[in-house]
Amino acid sequence: MTVLHSVDFFPSGKAPVAIEPRLPQAAFPEHHHDFHEIVIVEHGTGIHVFNGQPYTISGGTVCFVRDHDRHLYEHTDNLCLTNVLWRSPDAFQFLAGLDQLLPQEQDGYYPSHWRVNQSVLQQVRQLVGLMERAGDSMDAPAVANREILFMQLLVLLRRSSLMEGATNNDAKLNQLMAWLEEHFAEEVCWEAVAEQFSLSLRTLHRQLKQHTGLTPQRYLNRLRLIKARHLLRHSDHSVTEIAYRCGFGDSNHFSTLFRREFNWSPRDIRQGRDAIIQ
């Protein structure tokens, strides 16, 4: 597995934070780093496989990667990221207690992926721009200024995350997408889902298409197919059982959609043929 080292990304041996744009981010094999990373998705879509679990990401997704996490990107479509790299909590001169602003693992579950709305994403861009222009001077006021900007970014993300329960349409869509991530295998009635999240059906269609480039049903199908591919690689369930587990009522229809999405049949993935080619 590829290991990325801080010496290749940070401007000096003491700098606690670095900005690394990926415009766009191509598919990238599994790796980990000796530093922490906040991944901010500007726009586009892709699959983020985080510690072996696949997540669909799009504009407004924010992922918190720790120095022992492993991850990769695949199936990317104009996926543009800004990576805010930071060494460790004890690398800062003026900041303490950062863990209170970051997602925390509880009972083996780490809420690594948050979502923010488009207006917050614009504020994030402005803060990141200030961080990029802050320079590399190591005198105390300059260091303090850069650390303050990093703290402001964490506060903004924390306040604006899904967990804060905002009520505008962007926030409602974020909540809906998080719900789909958990309930993808269930039968979905879009009229009922729209009502559940206090959105009109037309607004749901329009906003999901703007965020992901896909209609709601195509987005749901892709989500199901991603989960199915993960099970094909990492479980012993039959293709038919996986199809049903991921919300498909007919295994032949599942196989057709799967090949159309990934250019491989479920059997090819089960036998690891895609990995051999790569």
From Swiss-Prot:
Main location (coarse class): cytoplasm
Keyword hit for DNA-binding: yes
SMART domains reported for this sequence: HTH_ARAC
CDD domains the record matches: cupin_RhaR_RhaS-like_N
Site (Interaction with sigma-70): 241, 250
UniProt keyword terms in alphabetical order: Activator, Cytoplasm, DNA-binding, Repeat, Rhamnose metabolism, Transcription, Transcription regulation
GO biological process, one term: rhamnose metabolic process
Subcellular location: Cytoplasm
DNA-binding stretch(es), residue numbering of this chain: 191-212, 239-262
HTH araC/xylS-type domain sequence ranges: 174-272
GO-annotated molecular function: DNA-binding transcription factor activity; sequence-specific DNA binding
InterPro entries: AraC-bd, AraC_XylS_family_regulators, Homeodomain-like_sf, HTH-like, HTH_AraC, HTH_AraC-typ_CS, RhaR_RhaS-like_N, RmlC-like_jellyroll
GO cellular component: cytoplasm
Any matching Pfam family: AraC_binding
Described function: Activates expression of the rhaBAD and rhaT operons.
Complex and partners: Binds DNA as a dimer.
Matching PANTHER family: HTH-TYPE TRANSCRIPTIONAL ACTIVATOR RHAS, HTH-TYPE TRANSCRIPTIONAL ACTIVATOR RHAS-RELATED
Listed HAMAP family: HTH_type_RhaS
Protein known as: HTH-type transcriptional activator RhaS
Naturally occurring in which organism (per UniProt): Salmonella schwarzengrund (strain CVM19633)
This protein's encoding gene: rhaS
